[in-house]
Amino acid sequence: MSLLAVERIRAGYNEEVDILQGVSLRVEQGQIVAIIGPNGAGKSTLLKAIFGILHPKEGRVVFDGEDITGLPPETVVRKGMSYVPQVRNVFPSLTVQENLEMGAFIRRDGFFERIEEIYRMFPDLREKRHQRVGRLSGGQRQMVAMGRALMLDPKLLLLDEPSAGLAPAMVEMVFEKIREINRRGVAVLIVEQNAKEALKFSDHGYVLAMGRNALDGPGQELLRNEEVAKLYLGG
């Protein structure tokens, strides 16, 4: 049984237009799965539909064997899924420590053990735990956002464009942290414009175009695909 099964989802931001037009995908236990495609393909919309921010008009979202289609985000979180949006993913006026504490709002059991694990994973955050997040670099803020999502001890982490706007050195650090998160047993579904780097460490990838599935396969296989390389990998 797949950890996540998205089946023929149709969704949009109004009744007239469907951004997603029957998209399907799967994430198995322990996998990293990448979603790539051009701007406007529906990648971020798909994450919102999975997490319950958007209510699908058709199709199903099944998570850990349970149909969660249309459930609100606060319910989806309790079932073991966390989501890091591309923007507004931290509280800039709060400290690093306070941001992480906000992530434990529904799970107080094991709080101190989890926050220590986050600090071991992101040692820079321990050093800056009393600083306001708004004063941190973009890469450090992304670490805070991921750390806060991990405070819920999720089975699946959804990441929307985690490398957006970051310097190249910070991009590599963020990607390495994603790999580390996955090695600790958390499955990851990532939307990423840096398609080449995302596919390098992904077990499977999906290419979306105009709100539909265009292609999918193992990450390394998609890297070698001539059509994918021409359209999305700059080669």
What are these regions (language model features)?
Residues 2-235:
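Glycine-rich phosphate-binding loops of nucleotide-dependent enzymes
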